[in-house]
């Protein structure tokens, strides 16, 4: 775990920061789609500005694969979601169906219900591994600068959560492909 800050965050926000160690990456995590040229250039521009402000800027990235991030969402979120939905359905008398849940939510529920406790335990092991990899990475830097999205913002409707025929693996991959740099932080717990 990281140590508590020496001063409150509010106090820190009112003063110029000390010289920061800022890692940056324009390369998507292994297995993820390549970031769009506009997104990569924005990172390079921001890195250059940080360097001009006196920070120590260097290229670097944690060794977390895109599949690790996707698998956590798929194999941890789905069974947790299934348990929560079952509880709410029991309390409300509603059932899981198209009138209450989008197609991709139903696909995640099906995936979660089909998992064994052993599979969930293995997925939680991936959460721990991702957390440790990120922790090691941040011992060498204070900030990691990346694109938020792998491409410019998508038009409304491209990520259609009610798309029939999309299974849990496909849906999670589709979502994580949009923001592959952020996915690992959600996957770390």
Map each language-model feature to its residues.
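Short, surface-exposed loop/helix-turn segments at secondary-structure junctions
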Residues: 1, 71, 76, 122, ...
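A short helix-breaking turn/cap at a secondary-structure junction
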Residues: 1-45, 64, 87, 91
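Short gly/ser/thr-rich secondary-structure transition/capping motifs
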Residues: 2-8, 124-132, 174-176
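Short helix-loop capping/hinge segments that flank enzyme active sites or metal/cofactor-binding pockets
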Residues: 11-27, 76-135, 147-151, 156-160
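Flexible loop/turn segments at secondary-structure boundaries
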Residues: 30-32, 66-67, 152-155
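Acyltransferase
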Residues: 35-62, 85-96, 120-141
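Conserved short alpha-helical elements in the N-terminal third of ANL/AMP-binding
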Residues: 184-185
């Amino acid at each position: 775990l990281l140590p508590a800050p020496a001063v409150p965050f509010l106090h820190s926000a009112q003063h110029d920061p000390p010289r920061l160690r800022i890692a940056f990456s324009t390369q998507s995590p292994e297995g993820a789609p390549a970031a769009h040229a506009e997104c990569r250039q924005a990172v390079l521009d921001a890195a250059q500005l940080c360097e001009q402000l006196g920070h120590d800027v260097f290229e670097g990235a944690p060794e977390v694969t895109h599949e690790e991030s996707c698998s956590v969402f798929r194999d941890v979120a789905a069974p947790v979601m299934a348990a929560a939905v079952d509880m709410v359905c029991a309390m409300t008398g509603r059932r899981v169906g198209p009138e209450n849940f989008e197609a991709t939510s139903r696909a995640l529920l099906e995936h979660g219900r089909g998992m064994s406790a052993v599979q969930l335990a293995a997925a939680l092991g991936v959460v721990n591994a991702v957390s440790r990899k990120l922790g090691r990475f941040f011992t060498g830097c204070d900030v990691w600068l990346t694109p938020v999205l792998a491409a410019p913002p998508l038009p409304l409707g491209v990520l259609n959560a009610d798309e029939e025929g999309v299974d849990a693996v496909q849906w999670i991959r589709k979502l994580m492909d949009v923001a592959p740099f952020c996915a690992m932080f959600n996957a770390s717990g």
